[in-house]
Amino acid sequence: MALFRKFFHRKPPEGLLEISERVYVFDCCLTTDMLEDEDYRVYVSRIMSQLREQFPGASFMVFNFRDGDSRSRMESVLTEYDMTIMDYPRHYEGCPLLTMETVHHFLKSAESWLLLSQQNILLSHCELGGWPTLAFMLASLLLYRKQFSGEHRTLEMIYKQAPRELLQLMSPLNPLPSQLRFLQYISRRNVGSQWPPLDQALTLDCVNLRLIPDFDGEGGCRPIFRIYGQDPFMASDRTSKVLFSMPKRSKAVRQYKQADCELVKIDINCHILGDVVLECITLGSDLEREEMMFRVVFNTAFLRSNILTLNRGEIDVLWNTTDRFPKDFSAEVIFSEMGAGKKLASVDLPHMEEKDVLPMEAFAKVQEIFSEAEWLDPNSDVAVTVFNQITAANILQESLDSGSPRSPDSRSLLESALEKVKEKTKLMISENIVSSPDTSSPEKEKDTMSSHKSYADPNSILKKVDESRGLRVSVQRNVHSKIFSPRMVQSPVTSPLPNRSPTQGSPASISRFHSSPSSLGITSILHDHGSCKDEESTSSSPASPSISFLPTLHPLTSSQPKKASPQCPQSPTPVHSNGPPSAEAAVTSSPLPPLKPLRILSRPPPPPPPPPISSLRSTPSPSSTSNSIATQGPPPPPPPPPLQSHRSALSSSPLPPPLPPKKLLATTNPPPPPPPPLHSNSRMGAPTSSLVLKSPPVPPPPAPAPLSRSHNGNIPPVPGPPLGLKGRGILQNLKGQGQTRKANLKPYHWLKLTRAVQGSLWAEAQKSDEAATAPDFDISELEKLFSAVNLSSDSENNGGKSGRRARPKVEKVQLIELRRAYNCEIMLSKVKIPLPDLMSSVLALDESVIDVDQVDNLIKFCPTKEEAELLKGFTGNKETLGRCEQFFLELLKVPRVETKLRVFSFKIQFHSQVTDLRRGLNTIHSAANEVRGSAKLKRIMQTILSLGNALNHGTARGSAIGFRLDSLLKLTDTRSRNSKMTLMHYLCKVLAEKLPELLNFPKDLVSLEAATKIQLKYLAEEMQAISKGLEKVVQEFTASETDGQISKHFRMNLKEFLSVAEGEVRSLASLYSTVGGSADALALYFGEDPARVPFEQVVSTLQNFVRIFVRSHEENCKQVEFEKKRAQKEAENEKLKKGVYNEN
């Protein structure tokens, strides 16, 4: 039916753009030109007339997106044609979105109209500036009717229908992140039982900003928040209102810098319901000028937990301000149930209560003990200064490491680094060009090109519309680079817009879910791997004895009478020699290379010769060739090889030809040696040049056969081995020999050198006067030791099975890169179940068959796009593929297999991750409550305050109402005049004498030590990973609806998991919000600013204070015990003295 529909498809009338079947858009929506009323009426009337002619029995409905409540021009024109018009708003609080209630009404109305009759046609129109909203609504309709899949791909397809600049002209902020979020709401309509779900009232507690963006030019910003939405206390009023607006002159408005803090928490405590617009605005130094930082639009009914984590690619930002946000920036919006009243943390200041506390008069003697000691100036606090320096250095280092590649500084660093790499590469190439000429491969060049392409802007999704439509776009930009009012979005056409380069587009998070499989760290490729692979494949496969593709190398022949003989057969057969030996046959076994014209001397050396067609019993020594001997005229063609050969008096090994002249050797590179002869059995003899001089002139080689496609026509063909040699010894090797003998031996996987470098031992070995004689190898022993085929005793004794043993081994076809395929097979060797059963277990989410480590390894070896195309294009026998290729084919049978594996990995680790995170959050919560609830610690802090005021009485530091938390550690810095006691020892002494019940206060802080080992930053990352992972699970659950039967069990098991996991994550997010409040309240408890003194610093300082306090108390006890023993000893000594005195 699709083919017939395409064949009979009719073009839409001029002025309409077809989005899908029976859904059209007026092309005036895709331009910024404003038609006059009369021209507009003519334009619409012409389109309506063509529609009536093309669809005579059709009914039409028009969806119009307008601004305001006044009557639109489209409505006034279409009243003459008796058409149904439905008006919708053009935006929602300045955002090119509509509320979920309006979107649902639009989708149901459009679907009902199109299903009512096949003659019904839907027309879409928007007023000037409404194209972003219209594009979002059309994408929603396509996803709702399941005509397209994938939110980003669908929205991108719609935006491509208009010029690329149109979206930026009509929307100062990039609306794609929020639009994609709402499209995901629509795609998830089958996850729950009811869609859209009922709105839930929540309380937006706070917003946490991690890694402060730079909006003031000094590495910081001054953020304030505004919230728009429906009032949850007025259910009858559905209009949006300003629910929260932070006053510009309030104490909560302050400047935050990246060097001071990584996390900023801003309390809001605003009740929300339904569709919510959250705006973050930064104020100028005058607290009047406003600039939009980011905007987030969401719906409370679709929040699956009480935390909404957004990274840099999931917020609406100005088109030219993406680089102001750090790469790892994130905004955490924390919610709580509206009905659950949140108890505010009470802050008890130490100076407010003086019951059971030592007064300042109790430390009257402390001024005498520490009269010459002074406390450090609190303004020059060393501990705080050092900590701030360390924190600033760490933040700066992280900012540099995670900087955006699009920022000018990071771009310059990258360019300089690339230049250094290029210079080093050039230097290495120039040094190694002689020894390793083939250091690059097409695969590496392709990888390099792809890596450079990745630096291009991946965010441009809007392309220019086809010029044949006659659309004219008037691109007018203002010079303003900033938006000073967040409400200016309501009139985007006339708003001042930021300048933006053509390469900047939507944020990078549009493709953030596409992840490639992580590698195993294999970054090195063997040198000359391509040639090595070719050699192995050539030598391992049985070579055909046909000589049609190889020119032959003819041996020197004697002056015997020529005798007609039949042509040599393609398959050599044993021939017995009965003739007597000939004296002239002594030189018949020393072949010379074929003659080549002198003009080839300037060309590069030819490629290495192929391996011999048959396996050799002897190992001939390499001989150098010369191109300078081609000086005589062409001799007569050689005779065909005779059937009968004569015994050779000398060795049958090839003799090296005479060396070329020195002048020629100095100007040309020596070509590779010729291959060994085809059949040779005798041992090598000493090569001599006199035998070559006695031989007749060498006949020219015959014309080579046509080259294959892979050969270069400019490079001369490589000479091949001779067809036969005279001598009786060679005939013994031909007996019982099949196609090839070398295939029965295991290969030696060396890295072959294609040319000998001058001065190396290989070049010296090729000289005739220094040629080394290779030892004789027993081939039968080699076959017995290194045979590639297992030879059993039965097969050796049974001659009938010899042919079966000699059958060549079936070669496996390798399509995947060798090293990756090898590593993949190692990974598969640890999986003890067949591949089909493995994938069935993955789709069933069966954790008993495969563990998380194996799932992660499967993710690493998911086929890439190039590998998938390579496997899909393979048309041969799939049984001949290697195990890695077979594994990849099994993976390709499952749609989005990598995403499903990641979902499986998340499911396996979910419960352990939730348990660990909950344990850490409970530890922090317990530690904060224990510190704030310890009455003994509070009395000790007040005692320290009295001690400090006693010491600083009469000075500027006196009469303090409190002290900084890090001052606790300075109690050990102030020593007495005799340096035998510190303030900490004195404090313990006084408490032991007057308030001994406070000495065991560390027992109240049992969770403090465990809390010092936990960082809120890591807990936040874990919480974000769990929330994001659950979102990916929901997305895959939605996308798997169209997979068919293969994902049936996957969806069923995943739905059960989601029913449990969503409740767990919601509870965990609520605990996370509570713990965050407790951590901030702990800093406030000691009068500190949570933004400057984080929770980690508070608990670390308290733990150090407890440890020093306990140690000082123990030292005091030891000192008291020592003094007591010394007093007893002195008393005994006195008694002894008195006794002696009395005796005298």
From Swiss-Prot:
What residue ranges carry the coiled-coil annotation? Answer: none
Query: Could you tell me where the Polar residues compositional bias lies?
Result: 491-522, 555-580
Q: Which UniProt keywords apply?
A: Hydrolase, Protein phosphatase
| MF-aspect GO terms | phosphoprotein phosphatase activity
Name all Phosphatase tensin-type domain ranges: 17-193
From start to end residue, where is composition biased (Low complexity)? 538-548, 614-629, 644-653, 679-695
Looking at the keywords, is Hydrolase present? yes
Q: Where is the C2 tensin-type domain?
A: 199-338
What SMART domains does the entry give? FH2, PTEN_C2
Return the Basic and acidic residues bias intervals: 441-450, 526-536
Q: What residues make up the catalytic site?
A: 126
Region of interest called Disordered, as start-end residue ranges on this chain: 429-463, 482-729
Q: Known PROSITE patterns for this protein? A: C2_TENSIN (PS51182), FH2 (PS51444), PPASE_TENSIN (PS51181)
Give the matching InterPro entries.
C2_domain_sf, FH2_Formin, FH2_Formin_sf, Formin_homology_domain, Prot-tyrosine_phosphatase-like, Tensin_C2-dom
Disulfide pattern: none
Report the residue ranges that make up the FH2 domain in this protein. Answer: 735-1135
**Highest taxon, organism lineage:** Eukaryota
Q: Where is the composition biased (Pro residues)?
A: 603-613, 633-643, 669-678, 696-705
Hey, which family's this protein in?
Belongs to the formin-like family. Class-II subfamily.
Listed name of the protein = Formin-like protein 18
Name the source organism.
Arabidopsis thaliana
Gene (name only):
FH18
